[in-house]
């Protein structure tokens, strides 16, 4: 595992290593052989993962550092892209490539595949409310330190998998302007950015300010070969899995269940559904409709709708930011400081036109003039695609403000021990406004699908049962012919944008002290103590047309939610003790122990204590053996507790009630007992209408998740080969009582297994043509599940001796994932263990629904992830090559008992099948030139030089771009350039 290369100012070891980090960028910082520095006093610093100030940069904490030079020499579009490519970051993470469930400009960081909620994001060691790295100006950052170990004893909640700490620049003198531009080799996805930084420093203090601007153009999925079609899998146990161009069953010409008694009109119709003939009016069942074709046949093409083309593989965003960072010495021992950050981001996502139909709140009366079938349509009997409304889209504006201010200083106590103190206040505020377009107002359309008649006198259709019963203010609506001009006009009149707002606020008041207690033979025993009081509050306003009803629907379609309001406060105190035990003995060059504890008391669930024990042993000066054992926890968030109802559209792979003949299965209430029942959502891979909610809404208790983190490593910095550092760390994280959204498949399985608390969450149609089908289902948030994840980190950095043709630096960082095991409901009937390591789990599978952070989406956990780089510098010229490696993986079969296919038992010919994918390697190159006479630097580069395309992942019409946008590059070869001028 990597270790930090922090700034030690004039320290010799840092000076020797600076050349390596400037080109390689990612460092597991070695402790290099030193010259005689006895006359120098090395300044102490605080390393991410500890509150103790020390001279040593190599401690028990495994930290990887991305320095400023690496940030400046990358052509990555966002800071989030840069951090997400670290080998320790895996699993589902949001970024601008994520369209469905993304599109806000936000990037998340999830270390160890445990999800972003278990990785804490800091700025200068303090909590960062929004957690969005993209909102931090790149010209504001000195370095990024990533701790890959549990740190709840130091930072409190969320620091389970580790910490990402953005360290800001300070004491800057001068001015700097930078401009950059990039574009793909397909002439799309253009990006441009500008930044200006100014700073002044003196003996009394410093001030630094800057502004920045970045714009990234969106890219349509139809502009990439791998994403232009929605794709499904097919195959059998005796033949390889292949693909066909599929799509959504909800087409512009309808997906209409054949009513009982009309099957004879369509003999041999295996799908059981109809679609209108494109040129027909839809008023005559026998002549205007045909059997819905799930695939192309001799009778005609597939009726499925290719929704993929208009989706995005890069969501557009535009951001403007400014920052101020200053400090002032009030006295020799007291300093005031202020850090202010403001960012405004505009972003958007785009999806195919809205799906309309009876599962989403529509009801079509048998007495409608336009209904030729003579039966009511409700339940899962009718859907269609509203192309005339245009694409569904949402634009968001996010304002992110962060302030940190206070006083800090130092004083001496007994035996001339130096102590440092800090009294501070942190404030964070986020406001996000989202406007949604392309959704129909069902409160306007539904009356028009009630009884209606054709008036012979006027030649018009009116709402009502006859001339004497005309309903005023009602416009008849024809759902069976969405291309009719009158229908289009009615739809467009019924469409209206929905506006929602979210406000969140965090305040922290803190006091920190650290310093020496007394001298021991091996060094100074040190203590760090502190106290803080933190409050968090969230409030949201949801457009009335988007407020969800009990069926998961709303008047503006199916993308529905509800208001959220809630907050909590927490009081915390910590102590950390550093004990130098032995020093300068045979086989004990140094032996140090660190013990820490943090007490946290929440007004929502109570208190928790989390401890840490860390040991550092240097048998010789060049070799460090280190180990850490920590208790970790995550408190339930405001959303976990108070989150209201929000519509969801999950898929399920099985229904235990298929073929039900009685027997009292509690999951099968209202299901017919004649053995004929087949769940249509499973059989046709249709999405359910569901409601996801916080614990309070569903009546579920919730508390913190708890666990342990282990890290044992070795770092070798041989004095006989100056510039070389190698390290390896074995790590493991156990978590119990996971805070999770309990997905639809889990709710059904647990109820069927006798866990009756989940049964009231399932609501099936009690009668009619959809009897027994799931009408709606509540997916609550609660404590359920256990995670065991472990692996090994490796790092190598080597600064070669300088040659006549320049200086070279090489680096390698890699993570091996040994195991990733998740139990869905330990100790309960219905528990399933998923083995995620080396697997990709696709949307709609029970495995993906349980994947941390995926929200029912996709999750990939390759066994190996790695980065390597080679840097060269000679005079004013420099160049670098970087490689990123993602190991081969298998889609499906995360355990022998699981099907690999989201259709589950509804498509038994595909059960147990899997697909193997090869490894993926990306190459980036960069060239730089310093024109010193003009104080100007030029950088050009190419990302993904080989134009490596992402693996084609077949996830049955529901996956973003037919691949995994969290892990793979969707843009292809990308050219970029940057000019930086210093004044």
Segments (PLM) and residue ranges:
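Surface-exposed, low-complexity loop segments enriched in small/polar and acidic residues
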Residues: 217-219, 223-232, 271-274, 278-318, ...
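C-terminal beta-barrel architecture of Gram-negative outer-membrane proteins
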Residues: 648, 810-930, 947
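Short acidic/polar hinge/loop motifs at secondary-structure boundaries
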Residues: 119, 126-150
């Amino acid at each position: 595992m990597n270790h930090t290369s922090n700034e030690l100012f004039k320290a010799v070891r840092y000076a020797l290593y600076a050349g390596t980090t400037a080109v390689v960028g990612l460092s597991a910082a070695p402790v290099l052989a030193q010259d005689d520095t006895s006359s120098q006093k090395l300044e102490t610093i605080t390393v991410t993962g500890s509150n103790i100030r020390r001279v040593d940069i190599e401690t028990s904490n495994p930290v990887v550092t991305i320095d400023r030079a690496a940030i400046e020499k990358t052509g990555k579009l966002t800071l989030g892209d840069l951090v997400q490519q670290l080998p320790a970051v895996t699993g589902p993470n949001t970024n601008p490539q994520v369209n469905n469930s993304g599109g806000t400009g936000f990037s998340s960081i999830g270390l160890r595949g445990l999800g972003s909620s278990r990785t804490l994001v800091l700025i200068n060691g303090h909590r960062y409310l929004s957690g969005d790295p993209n909102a931090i100006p790149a010209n504001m950052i000195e370095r990024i330190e990533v701790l890959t170990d549990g740190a709840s004893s130091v930072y409190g909640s969320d620091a389970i998998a580790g910490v990402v700490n953005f360290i800001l620049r300070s004491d800057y003198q001068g001015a700097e302007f930078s401009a950059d531009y990039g574009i793909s080799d397909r002439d799309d996805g253009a990006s441009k950015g500008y930044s200006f930084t100014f700073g002044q420093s003196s003996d009394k203090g410093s001030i630094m300010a800057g502004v920045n601007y970045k714009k990234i153009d969106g890219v349509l999925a139809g502009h990439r070969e791998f994403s232009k079609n929605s794709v499904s899998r097919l195959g059998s146990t005796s033949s390889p899995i292949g693909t066909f161009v599929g799509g959504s069953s909800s087409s512009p010409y309808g997906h209409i269940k054949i009513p009982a008694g009309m099957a004879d009109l369509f003999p041999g119709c295996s799908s059981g559904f109809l679609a209108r003939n494109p040129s027909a009016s839809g008023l005559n069942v026998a002549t205007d409709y045909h059997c819905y074709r799930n695939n192309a046949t001799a009778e005609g093409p597939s009726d499925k709708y290719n929704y993929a083309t208009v989706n995005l593989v890069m969501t557009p965003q535009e951001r403007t930011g400014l920052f101020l960072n200053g400090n002032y010495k009030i006295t020799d021992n007291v300093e005031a400081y202020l850090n202010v950050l403001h960012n405004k981001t505009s972003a958007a996502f785009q999806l195919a036109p809205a799906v309309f139909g009876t599962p989403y709140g529509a009801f079509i009366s048998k007495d409608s003039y336009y209904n030729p079938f003579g039966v009511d349509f409700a339940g899962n009997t009718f859907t269609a695609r509203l192309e005339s409304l245009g694409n569904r889209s949402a634009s968001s504006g996010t304002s992110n403000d962060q302030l940190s201010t206070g006083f800090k200083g130092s004083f001496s106590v007994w035996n001339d021990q130096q102590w440092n103190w800090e009294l501070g206040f942190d404030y964070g505020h986020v406001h996000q406004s989202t406007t949604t377009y392309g959704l129909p107002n069902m409160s306007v359309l539904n009356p028009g699908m009630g009884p209606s008649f054709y008036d012979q006198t006027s030649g018009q259709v009116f709402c009502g049962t006859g001339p004497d019963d005309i309903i005023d203010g009602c416009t008849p609506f024809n759902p069976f012919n969405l291309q009719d001009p009158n229908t289009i006009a009615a739809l467009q009149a019924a469409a209206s944008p929905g506006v929602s707002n979210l406000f969140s606020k965090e305040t922290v008041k803190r006091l920190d002290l650290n310093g020496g207690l007394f001298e021991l033979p091996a060094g100074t025993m040190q203590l760090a103590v502190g106290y803080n009081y933190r409050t968090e509050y969230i409030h949201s306003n949801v457009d009335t047309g988007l407020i969800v009803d009990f069926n998961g629907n709303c008047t503006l379609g199916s993308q529905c939610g509800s208001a959220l309001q809630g907050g909590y406060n927490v009081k915390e105190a910590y102590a950390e003790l550093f004990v130098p035990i032995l020093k300068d003995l045979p086989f004990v060059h140094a032996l140090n122990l660190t013990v820490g504890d943090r007490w946290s008391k929440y007004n929502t669930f109570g208190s928790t204590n989390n401890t840490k024990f860390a040991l550092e042993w240097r048998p010789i000066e060049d070799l460090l053996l280190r180990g850490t054992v920590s208790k970790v926890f995550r408190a339930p968030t405001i959303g976990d507790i108070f989150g209201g109802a929000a519509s969801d559209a999950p898929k399920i792979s099985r229904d235990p009630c298929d073929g039900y003949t009685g027997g009292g299965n509690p999951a099968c209430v209202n299901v017919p007992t004649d053995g004929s029942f087949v769940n249509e959502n499973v059989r046709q891979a249709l999405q359910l209408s569901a409601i996801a909610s916080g614990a309070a809404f569903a009546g579920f208790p919730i508390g913190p998740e708890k666990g342990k983190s282990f890290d044992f490593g070795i770092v070798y910095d041989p004095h006989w080969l100056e510039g070389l550092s190698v390290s390896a760390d074995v790590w493991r994280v156990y978590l119990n009582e996971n805070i999770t959204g309990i997905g639809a498949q889990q709710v059904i399985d647990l109820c069927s297994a006798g866990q009756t608390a989940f049964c009231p969450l399932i609501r099936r149609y009690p009668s009619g043509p959809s009897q027994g089908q799931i009408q709606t289902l509540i997916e609550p948030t609660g404590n359920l599940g256990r995670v065991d994840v472990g692996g090994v980190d490796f790092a190598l950095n080597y600064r070669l001796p300088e040659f006549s043709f320049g200086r070279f630096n090489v680096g390698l960082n890699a993570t091996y994932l040994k195991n990733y095991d998740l139990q869905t409901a330990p100790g309960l009937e219905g528990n399933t263990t998923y083995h995620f390591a080396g697997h990709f789990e696709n949307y709609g599978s029970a495995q993906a629904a349980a994947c941390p952070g995926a929200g029912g989406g996709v999750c990939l956990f390759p066994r190996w992830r790695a980065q390597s780089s080679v840097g060269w510098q000679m005079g004013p010229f420099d160049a670098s090559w970087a490689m990123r490696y993602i190991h081969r993986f298998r889609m499906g079969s995360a355990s022998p008992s699981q099907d690999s296919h989201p259709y589950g038992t509804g498509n038994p010919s595909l059960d147990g099948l899997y697909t193997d994918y090869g490894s993926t390697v990306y190459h980036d190159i960069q060239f730089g030139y310093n024109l010193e006479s003009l104080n100007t630097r030029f950088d050009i580069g190419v990302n993904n030089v080989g134009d490596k395309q992402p693996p084609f992942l077949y996830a049955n019409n529901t996956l973003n771009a037919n691949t995994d946008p969290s892990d793979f590059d969707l843009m292809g070869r990308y050219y970029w350039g940057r000019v930086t001028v210093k004044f």
